[in-house]
């Protein structure tokens, strides 16, 4: 399978963003014709760092689950549904050959939408322990790439 279009999702922290940018840079070294689109969370650092690295990014209204201020989770289901709907729209418009999730809550809606649309997805886990999003989506991933054995 020839990969020409790749969508990369995730973010929230530099621990997710910089590995995502590194993946895109490494793939471009192999084949400079590959087209990339990043998807992150609105208002988070990826919305600034990814364009500075030379890639296009679209933000989703997704937020993480609050573990200390539980009342802030009241709008989470609505933001998740809107992010899922937008993810389906983004995937249908961009038509990627594969999706790559690098963790963080921003990757959840996009990888779920990719699964729904039959787009193969890969997970990259750079931490010694997988986060909630990567654990939840691991079962249907084509491959999982880890930094630690």
Report residues per predicted region.
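An amphipathic, basic-hydrophobic alpha-helix
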Residues: 66-98, 116
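Alpha-helix C-terminal capping segments
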Residues: 26-28, 93, 109-120, 139-140
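Active-site-proximal region of nucleotide-activated glycan assembly enzymes
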Residues: 2-5, 35, 115-149
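Glycine/small-residue-rich loop that forms an oxyanion/phosphate-binding "nest" at active or ligand-binding sites
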Residues: 87, 91, 105, 126
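Well-ordered beta-strand positions
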Residues: 56, 98, 142-143
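Conserved nucleotide-sugar phosphate-binding/catalytic loop shared by glycosyltransferases and other
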Residues: 3-11, 29-78
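Short amphipathic alpha-helix
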Residues: 16-27
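An aromatic- and histidine-rich active-site surface loop
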Residues: 44-48, 96-117
């Amino acid at each position: 399978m020839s990969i020409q279009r790749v969508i990369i999702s995730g973010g929230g922290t530099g621990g997710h963003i910089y590995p995502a940018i590194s993946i895109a840079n490494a793939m471009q070294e192999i084949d400079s014709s590959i087209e990339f689109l990043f998807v992150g969370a609105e208002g988070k650092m990826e919305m600034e760092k990814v364009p500075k690295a030379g890639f296009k990014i679209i933000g989703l209204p997704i937020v993480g689950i609050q573990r200390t201020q539980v009342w802030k989770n009241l709008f989470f289901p609505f933001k998740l549904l809107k992010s899922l709907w937008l993810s389906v729209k983004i995937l249908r418009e961009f038509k990627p050959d594969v999706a790559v999730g690098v963790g963080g809550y921003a990757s959840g809606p996009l990888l779920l939408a990719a699964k729904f649309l039959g787009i193969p997805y890969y997970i990259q886990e750079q931490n010694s322990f997988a986060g909630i999003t990567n654990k939840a989506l691991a079962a249907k991933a084509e491959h999982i790439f880890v930094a630690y054995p």
